[in-house]
From Swiss-Prot:
PANTHER family: DUF434 DOMAIN-CONTAINING PROTEIN (PTHR42252:SF1), DUF5616 DOMAIN-CONTAINING PROTEIN (PTHR42252). This is Uncharacterized protein MJ0935. Pfam families: DUF434, DUF5616. The lineage of its organism: Archaea, Methanobacteriati, Methanobacteriota, Methanomada group, Methanococci. It comes from Methanocaldococcus jannaschii (strain ATCC 43067 / DSM 2661 / JAL-1 / JCM 10045 / NBRC 100440) (Methanococcus jannaschii).
Amino acid sequence: MSIEKAKEDFKYLINRGYKKDVALNFVANHYKLSKEDRLKIIRTTHSDKEIKLTKRKLKKLKDFKGKTIYIDGFNVLISLEALIKGNKIVLCDDNIYRDFENVYGKYKINEYSDKAISLLLEILKHYNIKAVIYLDAQVSKSGILAKKIREKMKAFSIEGEVFCVKNCDYELKNKEVVATSDSVIIKSENVKYVVDLIAEAIEYLKKK
């Protein structure tokens, strides 16, 4: 069975108003999909309405030189680590790059953490961006990671702050300019612009 057929059916259902989890369960059961295939579908496939909305909000980092952006910390760092490791990163149908790491909530500081943080800060410094980074407080050792990022921000002379918060999604849904690949945040009415930092990293690394 081609996963493409399952994606077509999933898209058909969400375009007709079915909730994503309901549509995914139906398609996954019908095609007997693995956990990996379920993850691929939910991350890469969006309704036509979502695609249109995301593409309208999507901006380049250079559009915000000297301004502040609000960053979905774990979301971005996990994807940057995947990129550095050479793991799969896919350009999805809404023009946002996403990983298939599936470690959110179980994230642990590792040998790639410093590299991912440094890459993020290099890119922000390149465009003179001020950054407010949110980390979910319930994730183990998020406080230690926040301290590590603050120290590196100081070393890179980047203005901003890192906050460990109860509900990262809630904070970001109420900001105007966000950096995330999370569709739930992207579709918030309060979010005016979205920056894909993984796309920025891919472009930045090509120039190095």
